[in-house]
Amino acid sequence: MAILEVNNLKKVYTTRLGGNQVEALKNLSFSVEEGEYVAIMGESGSGKTTLLNILAALDKPTGGQVILNGKNIVDIREKEISAFRRENLGFVFQDFNLLDNFSLKDNIVLPLVLSGVDYKEMERRSLEFLIFLENILMKYLADRNSVRR
């Protein structure tokens, strides 16, 4: 069974000046099975970022479906989309995108705080990861000399 299905996905942008329409995605369909790895490749301007923004529920398509684990994410209401992203999606950015004014530990537990996990559970779960980073846990990311990428 596919964990991700994209059916006839379409995205059209309308330019601000002149109202011209630009088709970024046109009837794109594919599926991803559990355990598969997928690479998205293409020329600049070919729609890669548009596709990823739609798959991440950061943008809405003009048409089509995006079904993740059996749920069409296009139909998720605006007030529920943040919780859906937090509970079902993971992002791996090219850059770290961590909060400079937080310690590394604070950055790690932030998703748990946003999910309403109680303090004791947060500590327990974060320690599983933090033990590997013990020597830099309380450093601030703004101090670039002390925290190596």
Annotate each predicted stretch with a short phrase.
Residues 3, 12-27:
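A short, flexible loop at the N-terminus of ABC-type nucleotide-binding domains that lies
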Residues 14-18, 109-121:
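ABC-type ATPase nucleotide-binding domains, specifically the catalytic core motifs of the NBD
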Residues 19-22, 73-90:
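ABC ATPase NBD coupling module
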Residues 41-43:
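The feature captures the beta-strand-to-loop junction immediately N-terminal to the Walker
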Residues 56:
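Helix-to-loop junction immediately C-terminal to a conserved catalytic motif
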Residues 64-72:
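Conserved ABC transporter NBD signature motif
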Residues 75-78, 129-144:
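Conserved ABC nucleotide-binding domain
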Residues 99-110:
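Short coil-to-helix segment of the ABC ATPase nucleotide-binding domain corresponding to the Q-loop/switch region
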